[in-house]
Amino acid sequence: MRHAALPALLLPLIAAAQTADEQTMVVTAAPTTVSELDTPAAVSVVNGDEMRQAAPRVNLSESLSAVPGLQVQNRQNYAQDLQLSIRGFGSRSTYGVRGLRIYVDGIPATMPDGQGQTSNIDIGSVDTIEVLRGPFSALYGNSSGGVINVTSQTGTQPPTVEASSYYGSFGTWHYGMKATGAVGDGSHAGDVDYTVSTNRFTTHGYRDHSGARKNLANARLGVRINDVSKLTLLLNSVDIKANDAGGLTADEWRDNPRQSPRGDQYNTRKNTRQTQAGLRYERQLSAQDDLSVMMYAGERETTQFQSIPRAPQLKPSHAGGVIDLTRHYQGIDTRLTHRGELLVPVTLTAGLDYENMSERRKGYENFVMVNGAPQYGEQGALRRNERNLMWNVDPYLQTQWQLTDKLSLDAGVRYSSVWFDSNDYYITPGNGDDSGDASYHKWLPAGSLKYALTDAWNVYLSAGRGFETPTINELSYRSDNQSGLNFGLKPSTNDTVEIGSKTRLGNGLLTAALFQTNTDNEIVVDSSSGGRTSYKNAGKTRRQGMELGLDQQFGESWRLKAAWTWLDATYRTNVCDDASCNGNRIPGIARNMGYASFGYQLEQGWYAGSDIRYMSDIMANDENTAKAPSWTVVGLTTGYKWSYGRMDMDLFGRVDNLFDREYVGSVIVNESNGRYYEPAPGRNYGIGLNLAWRFE
C-alpha cells in the first residue's frame, strides 16, 4: 500500500484500493487509512492517470471540473495563474490562489499569509490530487476555506522512461520526459524509489499579447533507511515568462474577445522563477506510535509590469507600475501519531507547524521618458522599497474515536498564530515611513460524527471554525491611494456546519453534502485597476449550498462521472459606498455548476469520451450591475493505445468547446474601469503522443 505524507493535521493517506467496491482510491481525514466512503468529510480524489488521459497536461482546469464545490476558471492568462475557489472561498482573487491551502508533496504551495499558486504542479508526475471541502479544512490553519493536496508518483519496478508531446490550437506545445523506478520492494534497508520529470510548455495564446513559456521540473527520491524509517527528498523548479492580456469591458468583449489593447500599449508581462526543496523523515517508533518530520525551503522571484498610466505614478505616494519582489520561505512540520484505547479504540495525532517567509518588495515606474513622451514597458525610477516578514507557529491535536461498530467521532483543534512585520526603506518628501506590524491569533476547532447505516451507506455531521488573514499582497495597497500597508484590513472568521451522505453503488460512489458557512469581516475587493487591487472588510456574508457527485463504473469499459453544485453566497451587511448591497450575491461565484462525462476504454485499443460543463452567470461587482453570462461547453476525446514488446504507445486527439461557444472564462472582481472579463477560447483542437519504455 502506497502512503502519501500530508503536511498538516488531517494527514490524508492515499493508497491503491484493495477491491473494486472500495473505488480506485482510499483516503482519510484522520490518522488512520479508510476508504473515501468512510471519510467523515467532503473529500474527492482525482487519479493522476485519469488527469493525463488524452490531455494537454498543462492546467488543473483540464481535470478538476468533476469535483463538486470546486470552481476552476482558466483565465487564459499564464501571468495570473488559474482562478480556484472552493465553496466560494478564493473567488476574490485577481491573480494566484487565495483562501485555500495547496500542498505539493507536503510542501505548501500556499505561503504563510495565504497567497498560493498552482504553477509548480507537474501534472505529468501526479499520483493523486485530493480536494477537501468543509469544516475539517480549517484544521490546516490560516486561509483554509478548502485544501488541495497534490502527491507525486512513487517510483516502482520496473524502471520506466516516458516521453509525451501535445500540440494544439494557438501554437500550444507541451512536451516532457519522465523516469520512474525502484531498487528493491521498499521494505528493506537500502531500497530506493525515484520519480524525475521535466517538461516545457509554450503557446502564442488565444488572445493578443497572451503568449507564454514555462519550464517545469519535479523530482522525488525515497530511501529506506531501515525496517522502520524512510527518508524522502523532494525537488521542484519552475520558470515562467508570460504576457498579460488583461481584462476587457463588455463592449470590448462583444466586439473582439481576442484583443488586448492595454497589454500592447503597456507591454504588460510577468516573469516568475521558483526553486524549492523538501526532506521528509518517517519512522515507526513502535506498533502504536509513528513520527513524521517535514522540512522545506524555497525561493520565488517575480517581476511584473502593470498597465498603469504615467500620471497616477507621479504622485509621491504611488508605488509605480512595476513590481519586483523576492521571497524566501521555509518551514517544518513535526507530528506524532499514537494508536491505543481509552475505553474505546482511539487514535491521537499531535504536532507543531512552523512557517516563515521573508519578502523584499520594490516598485518602479513602468516607463522611461523618450523625446518628452513616456515609453511604457520599461523599468523606470524606484518608487517603493520595503522588507516584509511573516511567520506562523501552529500547534495542533486531532483525535479519532471508534465509539461503536457503527458510530465514530473525529475531533481536532489548532491554535493558529500569524505575525506580520514591514520595514519601509523608501522615505521621501510626501511619502513618510510606513513601517508597521500586526499579529493574529485564533483557536480553530472542528469535529465530525459519522454513522454507518449499512456497510455501503454512511452519513455524517460536522462543524468547524476557520479564519483567514490578509495576504501581504492584500495588505500592499490602500484604497485611498496612500502609501504603506493596509493594516486596517482585519482577518475574517467563519463558522461552518455540514451534513453529508456517501453511498456505494456497485462499482460506483454517490456523495451528497449540505452546508452553511457564516463569515464575519469577509475580505473582499475594494477596487482593481491596471493589475493593482486593494481590499476591504465586508462585514457579514453567508454561503449555503448543496453538492452532489457520482463516479460510476459500468462493466469493465464504461465510466460515468457527474457533479452538481448549488451555492448561494450573499452579503448580509452593506459593503457598497453609495448603494445598498445587503442581500447581493458575492461576485466571482457561480450559483450553479454542472459537469458530466462518459467514456469507453479498454487497456488496449480504441477509447473515446465526451464531457459537458455548465456554469451559471457570475456577478462581477458588489453592486451586481455587471455579470458574466452563463455558458455550456462540450468536449470530445478519442485515442488508441497499443503495446509492442516493452513499449507502450498512446496516440490521441481532442476538441474542446465543440460548438464554438463564445463565453467569459473568468472575471476580475470589482475592476474599477469595468474591465471585468477574461474571454475563453472558441473551438480548439489538439493531438498528442505518449511513449513509455519498460526496462524489464
What does each model-identified segment do?
Residues 100, 107-133:
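Short acidic/polar hinge/loop motifs at secondary-structure boundaries
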Residues 121-164:
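A beta-strand signature from Gram-negative outer-membrane beta-barrel systems
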Residues 160, 167-202, 207-245, 269-290, ...:
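Transmembrane beta-barrel wall of Gram-negative outer-membrane proteins
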Residues 180, 236, 461, 497, ...:
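Conserved C-terminal beta-signal and adjacent last beta-strands/turns
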Residues 187, 280-284, 290-308, 452, ...:
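Membrane-embedded beta-barrel scaffold of Gram-negative outer-membrane proteins
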Residues 230-236, 271-427, 450-452, 510-514, ...:
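Face-selective signature of the C-terminal outer-membrane beta-barrel domain
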Residues 241-255, 358-365, 419-426, 437, ...:
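Surface-exposed extracellular loop regions of Gram-negative outer-membrane beta-barrel proteins
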Residues 335-342, 405, 409, 514-518, ...:
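Gram-negative outer-membrane beta-barrel transporters
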